[in-house]
């Protein structure tokens, strides 16, 4: 059997892997505003299923010229995550519970970003919207780094030699972290397969297997709430890279919005499967494997 290694990404201040991006991203925003001569206040809107909320609040709290509002689904995060967000200190932070699931919160935030009337009203108040979710490219860029860091660590430890291909298995909900691995591969990192690991909300596993994405399905609340997502927004980026067609991807996203599903062409699915494989685990399997690994 091939050796298996675990990349520890819980050493940030909130114990979420997203700390690696969200500790850097606020500093990049401040520098970007300075370089562009921007003086307006920035309002960060965040939808979270758990991890992103606290990590974003911790990164952006008390950053001058910035305010942040986080929206999470009622009962859709772990109690620890809810308390982490609710107790966040800072004069510029706000947290709101949303009736619905993560997809409802994410869709609502996206609608605000696309509402020109809201943008005009905020402009009168000298406020500009931004995002700390992975729809913001600034979230994905720092995540590319630790794929290279992991590869370098394996070389340093003598486990591989430079040029050996390494597969990465990534727990996946919104397709952001695994997409960062795809970008690392495109940049030249010797990556074999990127394995998309899903829980019972296995919409991505079905898509990567069949080529049909169906968001209209039963939603499960699981013990991995950060992966309880049915509309994976970063998949749109992958589809663009594979098809190279704005119009085709726009058509797929229109179908998703109107019918809840879409199907890609066979050659598109084949191109995706060259880089990605997938699998999912039931709640029973998850609990059993945690017990096997840690007891």
PLM regions: where:
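Well-ordered mid-protein domain cores that form the structural environment of catalytic cofactors
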Residues: 5-62
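Active-site nucleophile and cofactor-binding loops and adjacent substrate-binding regions
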Residues: 15-17, 43-49, 132-140, 168-174, ...
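A glycine- and small-aliphatic-rich helix-loop capping segment at beta-alpha/alpha-beta transitions
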Residues: 23-34, 59-69, 86-89, 185-191, ...
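Short glycine/serine/threonine-rich phosphate/pyrophosphate-binding segments
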Residues: 45-58, 79-80, 174-181, 204
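Short internal beta-strands
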Residues: 69-75, 96-97, 192-199
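Active-site/ligand-binding loops adjacent to catalytic centers
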Residues: 82-139, 144, 200-292
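Acidic, glycine-rich loop-and-beta core segments that form the ion-binding/anion-interacting portion
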Residues: 141-224
